[in-house]
Amino acid sequence: MPRVIVNSTPLIILSNIGKLELLKKLYAEICIPKAVFDEVCAKEDSACQRILDYPDWIHICKIKDESQKRMYQAKLHAGEVEVMILAQENPVADLVILDDNAAKKTAKFLGLKVTGSLGVLLKAKKENLIREVTPLMKQLIANGFYITRDVFDLVKNAAGEQLPPFR
């Protein structure tokens, strides 16, 4: 199973829909940078509590070279920056999990393998850990996660779930 470095948004939204444990079932090691931990726990909500409840499988990792953070901070959040730096410092990380488009583009430019929360849900369905992706995407939207109609349909199709015949 792959090792992953996860940003705050995937942790928060997977926690909000009760699916944070999918990370443990899909990936051998889950690492979050200190900045991500700080972002998630800035307000003490259920996402923060769930991370604190899972100390055995969510590891808080510190980046080695703090000076690299300045290169990316103009357009990215501290957690996203640390995810990318940590992935570059630790070549054993197989994947980074980010939801922000600018962060994903930057990570890909750096040669990192990237997925997002929807990719995690698709992988979970392919591995029969969840029955359907569509109801979970609807829960994400209800919790404030923005998904365009095109992306919604693309993910639904990739999951092999029925698209309506007419729009």
State each model region's role.
Residues 104-167:
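Acidic, PIN/NYN-like endoribonuclease modules and their adjacent C-terminal/linker elements
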Residues 2-95, 101, 109-112, 154, ...:
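Active-site-proximal, substrate-binding regions of enzyme catalytic domains
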